[in-house]
Amino acid sequence: MNISFFGGVQEVGRSCFVLEANGRKIMIDAGLKIGGKPEEKAPLFPLEQASSIDCIIITHAHIDHTGWLPFLAKNGFLGKIFATKPTRDIMHLLLSDAAAIAKENKEKFYSTKDIDRTMELVQELEYDAETQIMQGIMLTFLKSGHILGAAQALLEMNGKNILFTSDFNNRDTNLLDAAEFPNKKIDVLFMESTYSGKKDLLPSLKNASKELADTVKKALKRHGKILIPVFAVGRGQEIMFVLENYIRSGYLQGLTIFVDGMIGRANKICRHNVVYLRAEIPNRILRADDDPFKSPFIKTPKTKNKKDVFKEKNAVILATSGMLSGGPSIFYLQKLIGEKKNCIILVGYQAPESLGRKLLDGAKEIEIRKKKFLVKAEIKNIHFSGHADFNGLLGFAIKVNAEKIFLVHGEKQKIPELQQEIEKKLGKTVAVPALLEKIELE
């Protein structure tokens, strides 16, 4: 039994591992990297070998875990793709949007036909339902708390329990319960390490929410507009709920929330899959006057040039994409970045080389579609992350206490900080795989 790493190690993005056991090849996630160099966007697995993969396990719908699937389907992969029902629904939306953005940027990409071919291969699995996916190989999805439908993948084979956490959040959010803890002894743990630096300590939801409301209030006082670039699923709804609560309380009186890009369609998917969200959300929907997805304070732009948004006196704009890699958030950024009264609030992880990361790093000038813009607007970073922070990752690894621990999905320069701390606490070696490395697990 061995595992090979074709992406998503010592980097964030293009997650793609291949586990070989019992004469079978199982791929765990098949993503693309957002931002960065074109040659580093795809996993390093040879596409001409797509037909050699027996099945694929998809942990959640984000493009850095799913964006490569249509390329595999296009090149001969015919096996099953295992995912939760919400992941299947969201995946179709995000893959279609990625294809549209690529077309806009004149990149070679997959077609609608390739997406349809991919979706036909998806087999939905429920959480906590142990399923035989191959002879002698069992799969159980555990809740990961990352986004709607996201899962940890627990594989049982050859007498071993192997857990892939994928992206997980060990704290409750407005939408989701915290990640489940496995109820079986784990032999091999593959744990994400997005926030693996000792300084990566994230605020509580309560503190982040208050900071967001205060930042919005200050910008409105100086007659500015606020842009919050968000992922369509997860952060989009999280921020929407927070702002809507502050409007209802009277703290952000007169505020209008504009949602643009895929957020509206993502909201419909969330509402359709409401049984997978925290229990209080279905209860709110049952009370007709308190449906968070149909709030009177939330609007979509009515005109193509967004004039109605800019005419609104008190406006917050939630727009995709969350790292400013495409979508309408780019349009709003160009309009707002050049005035001091405006505010750009970054609320999620920003990948190295992404436009969002450049703003976080204090860039004085940015380039959008070959045009330069001076950065004069206030740039604010308020964490509403769907990931565990340094302490959350450390605590999870200690509690699981697996025989073998591998850190994946993290920034190369930060991972050693978490690695050393886990080794110190548990007194065992923690491995950090390299790209194209193959490791024996028995």
Model regions and ranges:
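Short, solvent-exposed amphipathic alpha-helical segments in soluble enzyme
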Residues: 20-22, 156-158, 179-183, 242-248, ...
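His/Asp/Glu-rich metal-coordinating catalytic cores
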Residues: 1-57, 62-66, 71-238, 244-251, ...
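Generic long, charged, amphipathic alpha-helical segments
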Residues: 367-395
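Redox- and metal-dependent alpha/beta enzyme cores, enriched for Fe-S-associated oxidoreductases
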Residues: 338-374
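A general structural motif
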Residues: 201, 205-209, 293-305, 323-325, ...
